From Swiss-Prot:
It is found in: Secreted. Keywords: Glycoprotein, Milk protein, Phosphoprotein, Secreted. The lineage of its organism: Eukaryota, Metazoa, Chordata, Craniata, Vertebrata. The record marks 89-90 as: Cleavage. It comes from the Eukaryota. The modification Phosphoserine is found at residues 133, 150. It comes from Giraffa camelopardalis (Giraffe). GO terms for biological process: lactation; protein stabilization. Belongs to the kappa-casein family. Glycans are attached at residues 105, 115, 117, 120, 126, 133, 149. Mammary gland specific. Secreted in milk. Kappa-casein stabilizes micelle formation, preventing casein precipitation in milk. GO terms for cellular component: extracellular space. The keyword Secreted applies. This is Kappa-casein.
């Protein structure tokens, strides 16, 4: 089946990483009884039936209830995957508007167009008439009223 000249040059690390079934398995495969109970969120490992020798059965019962190594998980096994319990704070509440009927949305805000209104302001110019003479002028300054029209947007 294999060519001996080719096979003996393959490094053992390549075989172990390429084919995980050849890797070292520190945990023996234990059958899992599927339970759909909220009180047992972890897989229940059933006791093995007496198909193997009594020495292996005693060895199975001594093993701790731990998760298998990564080398076991990479293999296609018949073990059931442990379901992840759903936490209540991660639940997404349903949308509130599911029971409402869809109504078309109407834009009630009308667009406001700016109108140009002319504003009339009165500007008062205060001009003091000065004369070339050096005498004191007691008269009030002259006032001129000019109307200015400006457009404000």
């Amino acid at each position: 089946f294999f060519n001996d000249k080719i096979v003996k040059y393959i490094p053992i690390q390549y075989v172990l990483s390429r084919y995980p079934s050849y890797g070292i398995n520190y945990y023996q495969h234990r059958p899992v009884a599927l339970t759909n109970s909220q009180f047992l969120p972890y897989p229940y490992y059933a006791k093995p039936v007496a198909v193997r020798s009594p020495a292996q059965i005693l060895q199975w019962q001594v093993l701790p209830n731990t998760v298998p190594a990564k080398s076991c998980q990479a293999q296609p096994t018949t073990m059931a995957r442990r379901p992840h319990p759903r936490l209540s704070f991660m639940a997404i509440p349903p949308k509130k508007n599911q029971d409402k009927t869809d109504s078309p949305t109407i834009n009630t805000i009308a667009t406001v167009e700016p109108t140009i209104t002319p504003i009339t302001e009165a500007i008062v110019n205060t001009v003091a008439a000065r004369e070339a003479s050096s005498e004191f002028i007691a008269s009030a300054p002259e006032t001129n009223t000019v109307q200015v029209t400006s457009t404000v947007v």
